[in-house]
């Protein structure tokens, strides 16, 4: 899942291409893991990088890396040294649960609680819930008279294309400062052109309704005719 655009890549298909070669499949799972299916072994993922701040529901500060046997062989053959991100050093101390460096203990405690929530619900149920919320959000956006940006959308994030002439930066600022809802805007060449709404983690249907309302109010400030009622009605029907 590419966070800045809301595009979901077909990692399974990529794995089928890479598995018989000497290349490594390295996957950015920072936003996707915990929200959409990601089957490391079945999809032949060699390295999966995950962050704590998205679907794993805690502040940024923790990162996780899974490494395949194929990737370990490549790492072991690399002569160039490194320091903090030395995976070989981390692997050496892992069996003893003796971190190579001082760990962020408060974040680890928070992560344990967040993972308990995921395990209690069941990861397959989490994926299904996020999928339903994401699909319903896209339906709502279209019913409001707006467009989504991604042609291959991820369910954990909906990217809304700003209408012609609308300042997306001002939309984000209004939602945050006036409506009390903090969305994400676009990055680089998409800055001011899109607004991103999450449906991952602990976000529920009521949070999304509040977000849609905030977006509609921000767009109305720029004289955009938005049918919020139709959007919320379509959203609720899509969840039934």
Residue ranges and their predicted role:
Residues 41-53:
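Conserved active-site segment immediately N-terminal to the catalytic lysine
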Residues 147-178:
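Conserved PLP-binding catalytic core of the aspartate aminotransferase-like
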Residues 53-139, 143, 240:
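Active-site C-terminal subdomain of aminotransferase-like
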Residues 145-148, 181-186:
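A short linear hydrophobic-aromatic micro-motif
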